[in-house]
């Protein structure tokens, strides 16, 4: 897709860790395990005056708090942003509210596998050391096979060597596109990992006996979908 690009040493999360550090160094506060559930507007409905935040406590219970604000910058999905606006003072037209409510998102699951090796390698060239053939050169591989659910493979070693503690091992991510609440989303971690490993083995990319560790992550609303009410 592209020949060269910049990438954080410890992955994209490092970017936001740096942003968070700078915000806190400047006196800002970051609320973890919290989400905005309501926007309170001024009487004329032209600005946001405060937000209602729901925070999760250590005992698992939730508490709400109203926080005044001078500026409000949103990274919420549009669907949730419009739904959170105080309906009593809302100036959001009904057709806009209906469009926002009908927006569709694709959810995402990634299964990480730590491997002793991949079965696929770079093409051998005369005089090339075996160690140089251990990994394919790609950062990601898009999967075209119609008989598997897998959408894309990431090889984290090739993103940054600092993402893998042991450079002799291979750390890959298997990416699946799904919908929150569907059968694939509702699999247990163990079921999902077994499913992903079986698919990759069926493609000849790995042997399941080479799996050293595994992890599954769910990501809600990873991608906006350009259909349903989006066209309106």
Predicted regions and their residues:
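Glycine-rich, flexible loop/turn motifs
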Residues: 2-3, 99, 137, 149, ...
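Short, local alpha-helical segments
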Residues: 2-4, 176-182, 218-222
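Proline-rich low-complexity regions
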Residues: 8, 210-211, 222-225
